[in-house]
Amino acid sequence: MLIKTDRWLRGDDIPASEITPQHLFDQRRRLLAAAALGAAGAALSPWAARRAFAASPAPAWLAAKPNPAYATVEKPTPFDEVTTYNNFYEFGTDKSDPARYAGTLRPHPWQVSVEGLVKAPKTYDLDDLMKMAPMEERIYRLRCVEGWSMVIPWVGFPLAELIRRVEPQGSARYIQFISLADKRQMPGVSSPVLDWPYSEGLRMDEAMHPLVLLTFGLYGQVLPNQNGAPVRVIVPWKYGFKSAKSIVRIRFVDKQPPTSWNIAAPNEYGFYSNVNPSVDHPRWSQATERRIGEDKGGFGGLFAPKRKTLMFNGYDQVASLYTGMDLRKFF
């Protein structure tokens, strides 16, 4: 499990080669300037876009120090797999669509409006938001409800830093994340597969948990467009669709907010959506998972050996958030 202290390694004990494959470690402080991935990026093939992405030096703010409390002995998923096997329906429903089409997204300039039941509402420019707290690198597991998983080094800071800054009112019980929905930049928004814009939410105590990361980068680089640039949240004990991408609004509310997949299919996607091997999705068993990149065949993990899925994705320190709850009913 990832959470048990005796299963973790301290950062000083982990060779860089174990955290990042060597050929990728050499690229860790590189990125593509946002302007280079403007409208012209849509014409790039996925391999060309990846090469362009590694072309420029990373900004100073991205030199995040690895947090040894969030290291793991598990091997991270290769960068190429992380950036080409994605669910991001704003760019299409195939796993390859985000890498192929997300070049149209313009992550700069960018603003995030924090509003609702807070004493200090504010619209943050991306640069100001990134300076709010020290960046750190955390290696988290990501588990998709479709039965596949990855291990990814993310860069960001705890969402709780932002929450404390805006001073929630006592009546604020939930947080809603609203993603960009711009047909000019996101061709998938024209599809009726979901009600746009994409929306997700957390209970306030969930959002304040130190595991929740407001995320700006991965693998030592700025977030690629297809991975939710320029800012997203990572909630590692929940299925991946709970970790909203390309966020433009964060709302503090007193009632459980509507969430996109729950609206689309409430019998399949609950509000909580905690990783739970005992509660199957109607179309996918949740008892096991395939680790992307382990089949070595380039088939998206289709032939990777199955491994047992852990309750809360292995992050059992969140169990106290759900004391007394029937997690089959509140799935």
Swiss-Prot record:
EC number(s) reported in the record: 1.8.5.-
Alphabetized UniProt keyword annotations: Metal-binding, Molybdenum, Oxidoreductase, Periplasm, Signal
PROSITE patterns in the record: TAT
Binding site for Mo-molybdopterin: 86, 89-90, 144, 179, 227, 232, 243-245
Coiled coil regions in record: none
Signal peptide start and end residues: 1-54
Leading EC class: oxidoreductase
Needed cofactors: Mo-molybdopterin
Protein name: Protein-methionine-sulfoxide reductase catalytic subunit MsrP
Species annotation: Ralstonia nicotianae (strain ATCC BAA-1114 / GMI1000)
